[in-house]
């Protein structure tokens, strides 16, 4: 069995490689923007995957097994085209797990200050300064106000 990599939620080298390939396929580097596998972003993604080890193991097991079945090779030795084929097949067969991957990768990627700055969003928490909110039609909330309290007071 592959040796465990410390600091990554106890993922094996093979599992870490699978997650890295998937994250890079989702969000590759583009212009001045970093890839999801950037050294400042990817550790957070691994932590997020470690929050649900069952789903993460299912993802990695499926992809590692598919690589052997399709190409009689370890996923880590596959070329880019072969890796994409394995991951795309996984995407088609496991939509629930793909949603989990998307949440893990995107939520961590958009926490990065470089990414947020490129979107024109101020880095840091929204309070105490807050974000500007467009004026809206507050009368749309009138039915909610009229309804009154719908919760039990404790």
State what each model feature region is.
Residues 2-5, 16-24, 33, 40-154:
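Mature-region segments of soluble proteins
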């Amino acid at each position: 069995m592959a040796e465990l990599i410390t600091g990554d939620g106890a993922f094996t080298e093979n599992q870490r490689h699978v997650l890295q390939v998937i994250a890079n396929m989702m969000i590759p580097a583009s212009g001045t923007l970093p890839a999801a596998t950037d050294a400042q972003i990817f550790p957070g993604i691994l932590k997020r995957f470690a929050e649900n080890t069952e789903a993460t193991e299912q993802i990695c097991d499926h992809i590692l097994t598919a690589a052997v079945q399709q190409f009689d090779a370890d996923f880590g030795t596959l070329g880019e085209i072969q890796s994409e084929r394995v991951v795309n097949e996984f995407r088609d067969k496991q939509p629930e797990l793909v949603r989990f991957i998307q949440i893990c990768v995107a939520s961590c990627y958009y926490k990065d200050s470089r990414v947020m700055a490129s979107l024109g969003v101020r880095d840091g928490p929204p309070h105490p300064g807050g974000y500007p909110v467009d004026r809206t039609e507050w009368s749309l909330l009138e039915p909610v106000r009229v309804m009154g309290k719908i919760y039990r007071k404790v």
